[in-house]
Amino acid sequence: KATKKITKAMELISASRIVKAQTRVQASTPYANELTRAVSAVASYSSTKHPLTTESEKPIRAAVLIISADRGMAGAYSSSVIKEGDQLVSLRRNRGIEANAYLVGRKAINYYRFRNRAISGQWSGFSDNPTYEHAKEIADSLIGAFIADAQTDKSGVDELHIVYTE
C-alpha cells in the first residue's frame, strides 16, 4: 500500500513537470513559427548557396536526433520516441543513407548503449529544466555536422531528422 502511494506521488510529480515543459514549449511556439517563416522566406528568395539553405542532391549520411526523457515515470514517452527513431534510422539505411544517432536524455542513451549501437552525440541531465544554453549546445553540434561536407568529413551529414513528442 505504501509503495502504491509513493508510485502515485511520483506519477503526479512527473505529470506536473510535463505540463510545465509543455507550457514553456507552447509559449515559445509563436516565436518559433515566425522564425521558421522568416528563414524559409530568406531561403526561398535568396540566390546565395549555403549548406543550411540548399538540399543535398545525393545524401550519404543523415543525423537523427532522438529526444527522450532522463528518467522514467512518463509512460510510453521515451519508448515511443526511441521506437520511432529506430524506424527512421532503418528507413534511411534501407535507402542507402548512413544514419548517425544523436541522443538527448538518459533513456535513449541507455537504450543505445545496451544494444551496443553507435552514438554520434549525446546530452542528458537537463530534461526537467532545459535551458537555452542546452538547446544551443545541441544545435551547435548538429549545425556543425550539417555544414561539414559529408563527402569528405566522417562527422558531416546531409540530412537532419528530429524525433520528439508534442
Language model: regions and residue ranges:
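Conserved loop-to-helix interface motifs that mediate assembly, gating, or partner/ligand docking
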Residues: 1-166
